[in-house]
């Protein structure tokens, strides 16, 4: 989408019934030029027909591309003792960073589609059933024959803080650029795309290059190890939500003060991002965007239920808020509240 087309789209979002003459007057261009731009927007699928109905207004859905897996979580009854058996509670659920973000957004009321890879096993079927029960469209699933579905194992202390985790996400490597090209119409029609860095670098690069210029792409680094995939490769992404350690890796600097945090976020913005949201655990959230706005959403003391899921719920609230067109002053408190539910 060209810059002029973006300007026209913004005017039509505000008033879909604007005439070509009025659009031309507001932008200071000729009416015939407006007609050409509108025709191009129609060919690209951004405008559906009379009244300049925007495709994004027909169904403002989110597409998630990334991990959906079985979560095995253990939580000790007392402080953890390393190298010993700890009495506790063990549960199984469907998880995965992108899945969790999508489920949270879906439960908030957003239309959501998920593109992921699962094995042809009972776990894969469980993932599909639970996604559908949450209101997530699973037509984009790739079922890898002979492979096991992804499994994530985490161990938490008696306060709910994660001590260590292990993951087996090999099936996710079966997602390919060719497979995603077959989902082009779904991706092209999205209002926002969500990805996580558990994806192969080739997939992350393809989504950023093919869709990032027109569709906001939200990316979660997932971990310090996976965050390295984004270092120096942020162009094409709209929003990144790192924690403090991941932000240090992305910005290639140590962060020990508020001033250094602002500097690090600024470095990431300079690489092409529209906004950076750094989660700081109990300290809250720091937000910075391309327009120069810098905001803090302070944390409040609370009992942590699951530190792993809280960040995913926050991202779900962030993407949902984007669909609603909310300003950051409303988005951040909403997303923080979502992370505490």
Task: Give the residues covered by each predicted segment.
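Conserved phosphate-binding/catalytic region of the ribokinase-like
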Residues: 1-20, 26-27, 32, 36-56, ...
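Glycine-rich phosphate/adenosyl-contacting loop at the front of the ribokinase-like
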Residues: 4, 10-13, 18-22, 26, ...
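Short gly/ser/thr-rich secondary-structure transition/capping motifs
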Residues: 45-49, 173-178, 219-225
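Conserved N-terminal subdomain of the carbohydrate kinase-like
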Residues: 58-59, 80-88, 107-191, 213
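Active-site nucleophile and cofactor-binding loops and adjacent substrate-binding regions
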Residues: 89-97, 142-146, 308
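Short, conserved phosphate/pyrophosphate- and ester-handling motifs at nucleotide-, phospho-/glycolipid
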Residues: 105, 243, 311
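Conserved beta-alpha-beta core of the PfkB/ribokinase-like small-molecule kinase fold
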Residues: 192-263, 283-285
């Amino acid at each position: 989408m060209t810059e002029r087309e973006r300007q026209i789209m913004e005017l039509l979002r505000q008033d879909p019934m604007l005439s070509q003459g009025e659009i031309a007057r507001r932008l200071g261009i000729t009416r015939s030029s407006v007609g050409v731009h509108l025709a191009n927007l129609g060919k690209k699928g951004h405008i559906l027909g009379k009244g300049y109905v925007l495709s994004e207004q027909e169904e403002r859905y989110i597409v998630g591309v990334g991990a959906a897996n079985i979560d095995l979580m253990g939580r000790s009854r007392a402080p953890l003792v390393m190298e010993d058996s700890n009495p506790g509670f063990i549960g199984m659920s469907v998880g995965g960073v992108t899945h969790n973000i999508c489920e949270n957004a879906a439960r908030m009321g957003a239309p959501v589609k998920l593109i992921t890879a699962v094995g042809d096993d009972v776990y894969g079927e469980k993932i599909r059933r639970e996604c559908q029960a949450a209101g997530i469209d699973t037509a984009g699933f790739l079922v890898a024959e002979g492979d096991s579905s992804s499994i994530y194992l985490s161990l938490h202390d008696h306060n709910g803080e994660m001590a260590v985790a292990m993951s087996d996400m090999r099936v996710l490597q079966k997602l390919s650029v060719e497979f995603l090209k077959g989902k082009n119409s779904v991706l092209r029609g999205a209002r926002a795309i969500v990805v996580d860095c558990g994806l192969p670098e080739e997939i992350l690069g393809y989504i950023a290059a093919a869709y990032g210029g027109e569709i906001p792409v939200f990316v979660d680094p997932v971990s310090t190890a996976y965050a390295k995939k984004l270092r120096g490769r942020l162009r094409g992404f709209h929003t990144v939500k790192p924690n403090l350690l991941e932000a240090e890796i992305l910005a290639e600097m140590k962060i020990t003060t508020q001033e250094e945090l602002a500097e690090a976020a600024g470095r990431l913005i300079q690489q092409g991002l529209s906004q950076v949201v750094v989660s700081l655990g109990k300290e809250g959230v720091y937000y910075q965007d391309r327009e120069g706005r810098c905001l803090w959403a302070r944390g409040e003391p609370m009992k942590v239920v699951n530190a792993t899921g809280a960040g995913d719920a926050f991202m779900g609230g962030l993407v949902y808020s984007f669909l609603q067109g909310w300003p950051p002053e409303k988005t951040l408190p909403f997303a923080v509240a979502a992370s505490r539910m």
